[in-house]
A protein has these predicted regions:
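Membrane-lumen/periplasm interface segments of specific transmembrane helices
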Residues: 3-19, 247-250, 259-260, 264-343
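Short acidic/glycine- and proline-prone juxtamembrane loop motifs at membrane-interface regions
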Residues: 199, 203-211
Length: 458
């Protein structure tokens, strides 16, 4: 919390003297506005229920029932926090402001023509420039809301419901990944923390929640592919992971860094070599479709960098945000995650040898595997040094992706929503903690205070 306090005090001083941060309540894009709303009773009830019963239910429920319960809880938590600000302010208008995607729905009446012309409207000096968030993302992001509008789900209410509903599945995707790579016990221990994450304050309502879910599912499907027996079904799963990764890159330029976490998943999987060709083939599909339609991803990205530095990105001081962004991360992941990250290094140190491939005898002296040979499946391993080390490596990859994004200088402020896709992969570190109820209580109190004391911009 010292980092958060320093970011708040130093940030207020910089904003008061230089006016260069362009945020109302540093380090968050928010304003001080203590309030309650219709979602307050539900938010308190969900928090109390998860703190009281979450760890026990996570340990006892059948696995599939646990996944359903985690999704339902994450949705209830996110919806209730969003409704603290009321339906109109908390959900319906969040994606309709002058910066957002719903402002450009009518400009996509001819989708192929709009894609061909997309890069001509990114720069601020171009004719009819895109709003900030449209210019800042590849066209799959606005196209999502265009397609929702085309099927009769137009307007801010439906867009908000889409982001919350889909975004809440990110916790399920992370649980699936942790179970396949580090074992079911650790996944069960992580479940209440994923469902009750302070990040829900910004997942409802932000399009980045939707992006986080797509990215998380691309990694979850990859984890399934690299831990399943080789076969046609596994190859199809790897191809599906590639499809989702390709879509992720066309929802957000910065989410190409998900490849860092993907590399960790591949390293921990036993069938990574056989999955790679099908993963690559799937990953090429979405880029090929958009490229053939006339959209140039690389050109658009370079134009975005130019626009970023022509706007607030060129004014906000890197010297402040390069560390204040990490304070934002503490707020969206909570004190429990910070404590869990403190145990990640120890877990890696204790079990680092378990991550290295074991050498087996070769030649005539090699023992025969026999008809009952069994390859260990991490999903069935109990908690222990090896499982904790595998979890620690996965979390470390998430942290590394976040740090690369931070050092890039393309994420100065607003990272409480922009980094949601990375923050989800830090939360499993909470599985390494003892006294889960106390830490869950700390997570809930932090989220409730943030949502009731501040009026967040997302």
């Amino acid at each position: 919390m010292l980092l958060v306090l320093a970011a708040a005090l130093i940030g207020r001083h910089i904003e008061k003297t230089d006016h260069t941060l362009h945020v109302g309540w540093p380090p968050l894009w928010s304003n001080w506005n203590p309030h309650v709303g219709p979602g307050t009773p539900a938010a308190v009830a969900v928090a109390l229920a998860v703190v009281a019963y979450g760890p026990v239910l996570a340990a006892r429920l059948p696995w599939r029932a646990l996944l359903g319960a985690a999704w339902a809880t994450a949705m209830a938590w996110t919806w209730s926090l969003a409704l603290v600000d009321g339906w109109h302010r908390g959900v319906a208008v969040r994606l309709t402001t002058r910066y957002e995607y719903l402002q450009v729905i009518d400009r996509f009446h001819d989708i192929p023509a709009t894609l061909r012309d997309f890069t001509h409207h990114i720069l601020l000096g171009s004719p009819d420039p895109w709003p900030a968030h449209v210019a800042g993302h590849p066209p799959a992001a606005p196209l999502t809301f265009v397609l929702l509008d085309r099927i009769g789900l137009g307007g801010g209410g439906w867009a908000g419901a889409w982001c919350i509903t889909v975004g809440s599945t990110a916790c399920v995707a992370v649980l699936v990944t942790v179970r396949r790579l580090a074992g079911e016990e650790l996944a069960r221990r992580a479940a209440p923390f994923l469902a009750l994450a302070p990040a829900a304050v910004w997942m409802g309502t932000s399009a980045d929640a939707y992006f986080a879910a797509v990215a998380a599912w691309s990694l979850a499907v990859l984890a399934l592919a690299v831990t399943a027996p080789t076969g046609t079904r596994t190859r199809c799963i790897a191809f599906g992971s590639g499809l989702l990764f390709g879509l992720t890159c066309y929802l957000s330029y910065g989410l190409t860094l998900i490849v860092v976490i993907g590399a960790g998943v591949l390293f921990l999987g036993r069938n990574r070599v056989r999955a790679l060709p099908f993963l690559a083939a799937g990953a090429a599909v979405v880029p090929a479709v958009f490229t053939l339609a006339g959209f140039n991803w690389w050109e658009a990205y370079h134009l975005l960098v130019e626009r970023y530095y022509d706007g607030a990105g060129g004014i906000r001081p890197y010297s402040y945000w390069v560390w204040a962004n990490l304070a934002c991360t503490v707020l969206i992941t909570g004190l429990a995650t910070a404590a869990g990250l403190g145990r990640v290094g120890g877990a890696l140190g204790r079990g680092r040898h378990d991550l290295l491939p074991r050498r087996t005898p070769q030649g005539p002296a090699a023992p025969s595997p026999g008809p009952t040979a069994h390859h260990p499946n991490p999903a069935t391993e109990s908690r222990g040094p090896a499982a904790e080390t595998r979890l620690a490596l996965l979390v470390l990859c998430g942290l590394l992706a976040l740090l690369v994004a931070d050092l890039s200088g393309m994420s100065k402020a607003e990272t409480e929503r922009i980094w949601l896709p990375f923050a989800m992969w830090l939360l499993p570190a909470c599985a390494l903690l003892t006294r889960p109820r106390a830490w869950l209580g700390a997570q809930a109190v932090l989220a409730l205070l943030l949502n009731h004391l501040l009026l967040t911009g997302w």
